[in-house]
Amino acid sequence: MHWPPEFGKVFMILEDGFSRRFHYLRLSVTEACNFRCTYCLPDGYRPDGRKSFLTVDEIRRVVYGFAELGVKKIRLTGGEPSMRRDLPAIIETVANTAGIEKVAMTTNGYRLKDRAQQWFDAGLRSLNVSIDSLDPRQFQLITGENKLVEILEGLEAAQKAGFRKIKVNTVLLKNLNDHELSQFLFWLKKQPIQLRLIELMQTGEMDARFQKHHQSGLPVKTRLLREGWTQQNRNLTDGPAEVFSHPDYQGQIGLIMPYSKDFCTNCNRLRVSSVGKLHLCLFGEEGVPLRDLLQADEQNSELQSRILEGLTHKRETHFLHDGDSGVTPHLASIGG
């Protein structure tokens, strides 16, 4: 138990059995997506008529509950969050929650050019934009959409809107974009962003594609160190990326390598799906249902108790090395 003076009461901290503390929540607001990325939803999003996604009030209650437990950063994910018409209201609700210091969002950038200012004004301060290729034809091959130019224009719009923390997510894909590293590095010379190169991860529906396209990030790390890039220290709410900088580049490189040794040692995030399930790991269990405790503000104590009890079941590590990707069918199902 801890007693921060600003609360004036006993304050429970999210800590698991391996002394890892959790200050970061990834909150999915929808499973729907308008892209057909080869590594996630190659056949497009197929709606399940039985599902309804968390309402703004339910989002307010779950964020408040986690904030009281010490969460400081919320990342809105999907699917594609901008598919929600009430996204500005969601952003504003999260940003106005006491204790939340940073609101971020991961997006495919489809609506970024037109909505960046609106999102910034609502309280969003950090963006991750998925760009898996700088070649328009290859981008369309990977995502199913010929939208690279518009998304790059969206990055410019985001910078003009006031965003100072912009990252670009690029999934490393053997035989699809693994030859583009030099092009990305050239782009970073004058782009004040962080390029996050992410190893393709195995999920239930992606076994064959994983075997065909998985590319280790270790050769990239070796090249960066050889070319004078230096690794940076991690902050409390940072993700799992190994971040590198270079004096000749305005941008940075972040490597996310879930198959590397000790990847889970510094885990600092939990996930809540768009239907209100707490997921302890991207590659874990069925999830702990929370939605029944998001129907009234008076349920907050019971909600927090269920979260804390669920956390006792968090495993020390994933088992991807053994081919065990858990029950996650695809990354859109729990927010990646």
From Swiss-Prot:
GO terms for molecular function: 4 iron, 4 sulfur cluster binding; cyclic pyranopterin monophosphate synthase activity; GTP 3',8'-cyclase activity; GTP binding; metal ion binding; S-adenosyl-L-methionine binding. Residues 17-238 form the Radical SAM core domain. Keywords: 4Fe-4S, GTP-binding, Iron, Iron-sulfur, Lyase, Metal-binding, Molybdenum cofactor biosynthesis, Nucleotide-binding, S-adenosyl-L-methionine. Binds 2 [4Fe-4S] clusters. Binds 1 [4Fe-4S] cluster coordinated with 3 cysteines and an exchangeable S-adenosyl-L-methionine and 1 [4Fe-4S] cluster coordinated with 3 cysteines and the GTP-derived substrate. GTP binds at residues 26, 75, 106, 167, 269-271. It is an enzyme of class 4 (lyase). Monomer and homodimer. NCBIfam families: moaA. S-adenosyl-L-methionine binds at residues 39, 79, 130, 201. [4Fe-4S] cluster 2 binds at residues 264, 267, 281. Belongs to the radical SAM superfamily. MoaA family. Pathway: Cofactor biosynthesis; molybdopterin biosynthesis. Its cofactor is [4Fe-4S] cluster. Its EC number is 4.1.99.22. [4Fe-4S] cluster 1 binds at residues 33, 37, 40. It catalyses: GTP + AH2 + S-adenosyl-L-methionine = (8S)-3',8-cyclo-7,8-dihydroguanosine 5'-triphosphate + 5'-deoxyadenosine + L-methionine + A + H(+). SMART domains: Elp3. Catalyzes the cyclization of GTP to (8S)-3',8-cyclo-7,8-dihydroguanosine 5'-triphosphate. InterPro entries: Aldolase_TIM, Elp3/MiaA/NifB-like_rSAM, MoaA, MoaA_NifB_PqqE_Fe-S-bd_CS, MoaA_twitch, MoCo_biosynth_MoaA/MoaC, rSAM. Pfam families: Fer4_12, Mob_synth_C, Radical_SAM. One of its GO terms (biological process) is Mo-molybdopterin cofactor biosynthetic process. This is GTP 3',8-cyclase. It comes from Tolumonas auensis (strain DSM 9187 / NBRC 110442 / TA 4).
